[in-house]
């Protein structure tokens, strides 16, 4: 199944963007070529940009604390798997502790490292990181791959608590919903929300329907899923077919 996700608010949108960026960082960090490690470094810059737009650390701590308080009373419920519950609460508490021990904001990493700041200022310019622009960076790229990787890991380490906290919140959110089979009649589906508040919509599409692309939108009253196809020039065009998919609405 192919999963498409749509966030209902800016906070979840930010967490999804961070998740995507951290996954990208993992991939390029595991590669060997200097250009791939260049992408890893610029991805760290993007993570700092996204995380620095709001007081994300405080928001994550508040949300994790709210989830911990909601789960704590379940310890006396015999119908709940207590081992699984304790594991989740322990993970939440570890996330809160890691975030609480993090000093400063995400952007502090750049403020404390002039060398990285110089790379970032050039990286926003097309072709701005050539060897004649940043000879020290060019020399660094010729180091052994393991040495470069160790440096990047060191620079990314201050962001680990944000990744941990965001990952816990997103996993709990995704596990909060139940999926149901629906059909987009004539390529379109809409559903009244009846006053219920959601934070994330998931659309699961069978891989045999890869040609159909869901475009999702929502407000506090209704959600829409409209399927399109791309023509030879990759332009979207409407679909008239009935398309089955799984819909999952998630909310804490």
From Swiss-Prot:
Q: Family membership, please give it.
A: Belongs to the ZapD family.
The principal location of this protein is: cytoplasm
GO cellular component terms, alphabetically, are: cell division site; cytoplasm
Keywords, A to Z, come to: Cell cycle, Cell division, Cytoplasm, Septation
Name any Gene Ontology BP term: FtsZ-dependent cytokinesis
Which PANTHER family does the protein's record reference?
CELL DIVISION PROTEIN ZAPD (PTHR39455:SF1)
Identify this protein by name.
Cell division protein ZapD
What is the originating organism of this protein?
Answer: Cupriavidus metallidurans (strain ATCC 43123 / DSM 2839 / NBRC 102507 / CH34)
Q: Where, per UniProt, does this protein localize?
A: Cytoplasm
Function statement: Cell division factor that enhances FtsZ-ring assembly. Directly interacts with FtsZ and promotes bundling of FtsZ protofilaments, with a reduction in FtsZ GTPase activity.
Q: How does it assemble?
A: Interacts with FtsZ.
Asked if the record carries the keyword Cytoplasm, the reply is yes
